[in-house]
């Protein structure tokens, strides 16, 4: 079926019950790397993404500029920590909803999250959420949610060979998801 519309899904606590595991692995990984003074008031950050929060805390702790080349080592350690925690479960019905829209409607699906890629793939796999890796956008190289969502939309256009989607709906659970959709002029659920 030709895809004419798009749903952009957030992942943590939208499709997967993973926010607690994510935060534990994330904060403990920062500590592993010597980032011990951590502002955990996530809503206070201008960009609620792993890369942006890591950047600001890194710079505050080490008094030097953050470089994205730090992300791969951080991501590896965070992934190890995620795998040591309880398995991620789906939000009830999430996998059925994703499958329904992908297989039975003219809605394409993509994923946009402020998390880092490797932990996200683990969460989706553990929760048995069907996904195409090329349709997952994360914060590995992008600091803002708006840019993450825009990149996910572009990936979906390429993957589904669509020049422009008639309607785009962002689905998320955080106030930052709502703000992002509003800033981009797309629908929000």
Regions inferred by a protein language model and the residue ranges of each:
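N-terminal helical cap/lid subdomain that shapes the substrate entry/recognition surface
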Residues: 2-9, 15-93
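Conserved H-loop
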Residues: 36, 130-134, 162
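A short, structured active-site edge motif that brings together acidic residues
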Residues: 41-45, 71-72, 130-144
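Alpha-helix termini
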Residues: 62, 104, 154-163
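Substrate-recognition element of Asp-dependent hydrolases with the DxDx(T/V) motif
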Residues: 94, 98-125, 135-143
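Short active-site oxyanion
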Residues: 105-110, 166-168, 185-188
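Acidic, divalent-metal-coordinating active-site segment for phosphoryl/phosphodiester hydrolysis
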Residues: 144, 169-187
